Amino acid sequence: MFFITMLQLYDKLLELPLFIGISTDELSDIVGQTKFGFHKLIADKPLVSMDDKCTQLFFLMNGTLRVISHADNHRYRIEEELSAPAVIQPEHFFGLMQRYTKDFIAQTDCSLLSLDKSEVLRLLDNYLIFRLNLLNSISMQAQRMSHIPWRQQPSDIRQQFVNFLRLRCLTQAGRKVLRITMEDLAQELHQSRLNISHMLNTLQRDGLLTMSRGIITIPQLETLRG
């Protein structure tokens, strides 16, 4: 456990997307009446794993989490980082599949707040701005996902690779680590292994990624996108 002053809690909540725009009076009520859980994770300790039930809404207040996304067939995975302030998969808190779809592990020492479902429902009932912020967050993600099938598919192999990463990453910038064999990547991109090898070696010569056996490290996805 860790201790946090009332003033620090006010300031941290205002940084979170679900609390942006809430008045000072309402925020004072929320802090005084809401049962927050306080959590401290040391580096390398897991927060939640893929398929765990999403029974609490976690808010990353300080630190950085390592996020791991697995392919359904478990033949490859992508690792990336999520820095504070952030909310952990709020879109899975309600609906048909109320389970986390990624592993979240402390990359550095992390401080988090949590709310159980009854507290979230109470906030949704009592505070319009909180309700709108959550709806906006879920709606934006749904709108982005619904647009994906209609995008023009890239014909250039480099852009196909970038698109492959972007569709599977939680954030569109920063360091990404793809753990995949050359053969599986070729299959995913519908390209020959030789074409994949040429493309990756060119990107490595340009300093945009590094390769080792079964591991592709992209220091900055936004730079790779060009």
Language-model segments: residues:
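A cytosolic small-molecule/anion-sensing beta-strand core signal
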Residues: I42-A43, M61-N62, S83, T108
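Cyclic nucleotide-binding regulatory module and flanking cytosolic helices
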Residues: F2-F38, I42-A43, V87-I88, H92-G95
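Glycine- and acidic-residue-biased ligand/ion/polar-headgroup-sensing regions
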Residues: T55-I68, A84-P85
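Cyclic-nucleotide recognition modules
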Residues: T34, I78-N136
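Phosphate-/nucleic-acid-contacting segments
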Residues: I157, R166-G226
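Basic, amphipathic alpha-helical hairpins
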Residues: L124-Y127, M145, R168-R175
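Short alpha-helical segments that sit at the start of domains
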Residues: H147-R168
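Short phosphate-coordinating micro-motif centered on Lys-Gly-acidic
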Residues: P46-D52
